[in-house]
A protein has these predicted regions:
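Extended substrate-binding grooves/exosites of carbohydrate-active enzymes
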Residues: 1-190
């Protein structure tokens, strides 16, 4: 099978295997898809139609980290946003959400990932934003980050859903940030 045919077959198998699972709310078609090489827009449209044929009862969604036509194919769109962690401040999320909603009021907006790293060994009195790529990840910044992001999200009824990244710290061999190499330390629980 070609890459695209294989992807379609996997989507069919996924939906047929899990269509009756009580925790399935929607079918996700991509996460942080980068437009390198062939333009994926037509393929994502085909997957969207296929998902609807297999299960007309659930919406489709996608998780994006960029602008572009990809964001207008699925029923819902969610963005992976780390405002206040990878540069900027938590308030940047408010600006992003408000501008996106103003420009596209018909689109249902979600936040598919948001989070900040922390170490139980890193404590500080001041509220100073750390460098995400640095070794110092104080817990009080992670707490502030989540409190500020939640306020921003809760004040916007047009946001259909949010997903914290992540419940637990987890292994990620390529990570060299925080006080433990090979760990993504964005977990709410260490």
């Amino acid at each position: 099978l070609s890459f695209r045919e294989n992807g379609k077959q996997q989507l069919i198998e996924l939906i047929r295997q899990h269509y009756n699972h009580p925790s399935i709310c929607f079918w996700g078609l991509f996460n942080e898809l980068k437009e390198v090489g062939d333009n994926p827009v037509e393929y994502i449209k085909e997957l969207n139609v296929l998902a609807k044929q297999e299960d007309p009862t659930r919406p489709t969604t996608s998780a994006s980290n960029q602008n572009g036509d990809l964001n207008f194919i699925t029923d819902n769109i969610a963005w992976n946003r780390y405002d206040g962690w990878y540069g900027s401040t938590p308030k940047t999320l408010a600006t992003f959400l408000d501008r996106t909603h103003e420009k596209y009021p018909e689109i249902r907006i979600g936040i598919s990932e948001y989070g900040a790293g922390a170490s139980i060994y890193h404590q500080q009195d001041s509220l100073r934003q750390p460098s995400a790529s640095g070794w110092w990840h104080p817990e009080n910044w992670q707490t502030y980050y989540h409190m500020e992001n939640w306020k921003i999200i809760a004040e916007r009824p047009f946001v259909w859903g949010t997903f914290v990244w992540n419940m637990f710290d987890f292994g990620a061999a390529h990570r060299t940030e925080g006080d433990r190499p090979g760990i993504n330390d964005k977990g709410l629980v260490t």
